[in-house]
Amino acid sequence: VANPTQLEAACEDFMVDAIDEARQALKTHSPGAKVELLPVFGNHDRKTSFSIYRFLYAWYRNVDDVITPLDADERVYRQYKDWFISATHGDVSKKTMRRMPEIMMQEARGINADTERMILYHGHLHEEVIKVQSGIKRHQAPSPADPDRYDNRNAYVNNPKVLPGHVLYGNGPDDQFL
């Protein structure tokens, strides 16, 4: 069984690998520090990513150091210290992506008013790109998925397959945002 993008690995294998990778990352980063998962669901793999997140939610729901909100919005907004953090899958038009800083500020005005630095995480294009756009650090994350037909046609086949995680440190060793 393969998912709609015809991944080389079976959907079930992909889900198990993604869950194991996420649990390993949480095991590495969560001892002694709170970690919050930001649920971001894709377009063609929305059911798969939602299922993976629901598993992680159930696994960590009684663990004090791991925060697992049940957001299912297209874009997720958080504040950490003076950081305004946004995450989205990124399956929008290039024009909308260029407007993402403006969209962030409009949709989360309270967070925008209380922060000095902004960062946007998104994926969708399966390759890693980091750039500053309108004063906002934009991190386009690589994908944990095997190449699909689109990737093969566009020569994205050598991109690393990773489950991206990011740590923003605050003032102390137990003060981090993953």
Predicted regions and their residues:
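Core catalytic region of metal-dependent phosphoesterases/phosphodiesterases
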Residues: 1-70
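Short, solvent-exposed polar/charged micro-motifs at secondary-structure junctions
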Residues: 48-50, 77-81
